[in-house]
């Protein structure tokens, strides 16, 4: 591939994402079968999702609620009148030979999502990505190919219809994205929003969040878009970024060598780190959409819309802005704290229990985060409650214990030991009448070091401080010890 650094200034990429989010309802969109992941193949099925004769779909009201809340969170206009349509196509994973989706009257459209990237200095760069539309639809089944990850090259294929009829919202962005990094951040922010709302778990490994990328390149300054290529089969955020970066280079190289870019669907191959051609891209006319005759149109009342709007939580971007402006936290800390709703809830509970916000942020984003990563735990699984973290921070700030003592006891605190028991009998010695004789004793016991210090080796002050801490089992107040040692050495 041509090095991207020699051509990025001459070309720009035009990128949009189509994201399917599986909604966290207990039952399917048009029937009562379970949506539970991991069930034995073809056990969560029923006559409706299998398209058997004589049955009719009935809309799951929770799907409409979740779709509207997602649309509101993405700053969309909610349609007062909407409907479902049949999308016709033939594939083994589609038992009815059509999918119930929405075409010309989606439930939500014309919104935006703010993304935030940090520069090398940690300063946030924010950008709004337009949302073209959000619509409801049912998922298809899942093909399992023996001997390959797709039909080509497999010895046989099996179909699991458990996923057929699982509710989805498809969110289509405007072509406002320019880089793979922006695309990956957009997808991550979208997942954060869905998780904060509680409408989707966004687990990519379970297929709850699936992204397709539409990408073209054009010379900088040209208004007309280039030929669009769709990329599928990206199963992680890093794969989204890498697939886009590869495809940008591929298209630029093709243009500069005189090749014509064709409108097609390509697959991202994780193993070879490249995209390969899958099929020519279909247009909407290929699907022969028409209104779904078995479902009534949808009307959302002002009262219902107002109720759902009032139930929206504070969203990730709103929290980041508040943490920075009101609590004085860095952009990096706010990103870590808002990445997962349970982390932000823990942080806010610690503050409510009296913790200094900056100190709480430091403990959560550094020491506690390192423990969680090492143990592969979530913050909800640790034994250190927010109230106990606040207790530890208060003990440090009031001089009862040192930061070093707290870090030494952290592993036990994280497994449930209370601060009272952890620091029993370990309060810092800050009484001059107790500390001064210990300092005098240490200085008297090290005459050679004292002579070297007074001859100009002032770095030896740390030696004397260390000896005092050692003698007191690290219970000597560090600040007071430093002041007292310096006074005695220079006396």
UniProtKB/Swiss-Prot annotation:
Record field: transmembrane: none
Reactions performed catalytically: L-glutamyl-tRNA(Gln) + L-glutamine + ATP + H2O = L-glutaminyl-tRNA(Gln) + L-glutamate + ADP + phosphate + H(+); L-aspartyl-tRNA(Asn) + L-glutamine + ATP + H2O = L-asparaginyl-tRNA(Asn) + L-glutamate + ADP + phosphate + 2 H(+)
Coiled-coil zones: none
Domain of life: Bacteria
UniProt cross-references to Pfam families, sorted A to Z: GatB_N, GatB_Yqey
A GO biological-process term: glutaminyl-tRNAGln biosynthesis via transamidation
EC number: 6.3.5.-
SUPFAM superfamilies assigned to the protein according to its UniProt record, in alphabetical order: GatB/YqeY motif (SSF89095), Glutamine synthetase/guanido kinase (SSF55931)
Molecular function as annotated in GO: asparaginyl-tRNA synthase (glutamine-hydrolyzing) activity; ATP binding; glutaminyl-tRNA synthase (glutamine-hydrolyzing) activity
Function field: Allows the formation of correctly charged Asn-tRNA(Asn) or Gln-tRNA(Gln) through the transamidation of misacylated Asp-tRNA(Asn) or Glu-tRNA(Gln) in organisms which lack either or both of asparaginyl-tRNA or glutaminyl-tRNA synthetases. The reaction takes place in the presence of glutamine and ATP through an activated phospho-Asp-tRNA(Asn) or phospho-Glu-tRNA(Gln).
Assembly behavior: Heterotrimer of A, B and C subunits.
UniProt record similarity statement: Belongs to the GatB/GatE family. GatB subfamily.
Protein name: Aspartyl/glutamyl-tRNA(Asn/Gln) amidotransferase subunit B
Organism taxonomic ancestry: Bacteria, Bacillati, Cyanobacteriota, Cyanophyceae, Nostocales
């Amino acid at each position: 591939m041509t090095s991207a650094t020699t051509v990025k200034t001459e070309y720009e990429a035009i990128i949009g994402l189509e994201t399917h989010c599986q909604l966290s309802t207990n039952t399917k969109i048009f029937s009562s079968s379970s949506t539970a992941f991991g069930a034995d193949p073809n056990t969560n099925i029923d006559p409706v999702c299998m398209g058997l004769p004589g049955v009719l779909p009935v809309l799951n009201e929770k799907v409409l609620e979740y779709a509207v809340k997602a649309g509101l969170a993405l700053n969309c206009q909610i349609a007062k009148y909407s409907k479902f349509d049949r999308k016709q196509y033939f594939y083994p994973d589609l038992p009815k030979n059509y999918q119930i989706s929405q075409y010309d009257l989606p439930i939500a459209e014309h919104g935006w999502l703010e993304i935030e990237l940090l520069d090398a200095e940690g300063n946030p760069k924010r950008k709004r990505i337009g949302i073209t539309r959000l619509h409801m639809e049912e998922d298809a089944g899942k093909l399992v190919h023996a001997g390959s990850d797709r039909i080509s090259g497999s010895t046989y294929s099996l179909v699991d219809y458990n996923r057929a009829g699982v509710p989805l919202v498809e969110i289509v962005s405007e072509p406002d994205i320019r880089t793979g990094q922006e695309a990956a951040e957009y997808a991550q922010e979208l997942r954060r929003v869905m998780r904060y709302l509680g409408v989707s778990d966004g687990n990519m490994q379970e297929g709850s969040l699936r992204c397709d990328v539409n990408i073209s390149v054009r010379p900088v300054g040209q208004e007309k878009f280039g030929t669009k290529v769709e990329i599928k089969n990206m199963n992680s955020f890093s794969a989204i970024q890498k697939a886009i970066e590869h495809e940008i280079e591929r298209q630029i190289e093709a243009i500069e060598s005189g090749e014509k870019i064709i409108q097609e669907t390509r697959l991202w191959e994780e193993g070879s780190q490249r995209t390969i051609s899958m099929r020519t891209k279909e247009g909407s006319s290929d699907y022969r959409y028409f209104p779904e005759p078995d479902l009534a149109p949808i009307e959302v009342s002002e009262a219902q819309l107002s109720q759902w709007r009032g139930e929206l939580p504070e969203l990730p971007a709103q929290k980041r802005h508040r943490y920075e402006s009101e609590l004085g936290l860095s952009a990096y800390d706010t990103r870590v704290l808002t990445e997962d709703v349970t982390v932000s809830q823990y942080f806010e509970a610690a503050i409510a229990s009296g913790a200094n916000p900056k100190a709480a942020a430091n403990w959560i984003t550094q020491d506690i985060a390192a423990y969680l990563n090492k143990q592969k735990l979530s913050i909800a699984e640790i034994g250190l409650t927010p109230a106990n973290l606040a207790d530890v921070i208060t003990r440090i700030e009031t001089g009862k214990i040192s930061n070093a003592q707290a870090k030494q006891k952290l592993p036990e605190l994280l497994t449930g030991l209370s601060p009272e028991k952890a620091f029993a009998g370990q309060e810092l010695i800050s009484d001059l009448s107790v500390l001064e004789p210990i300092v005098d004793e240490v200085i008297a016991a090290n005459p050679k070091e004292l002579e070297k210090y007074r001859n100009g080796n002032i770095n030896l002050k740390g030696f004397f401080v260390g000896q005092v801490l050692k003698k007191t089992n690290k219970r000597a107040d560090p600040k007071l010890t430093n002041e007292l040692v310096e006074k005695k050495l220079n006396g």
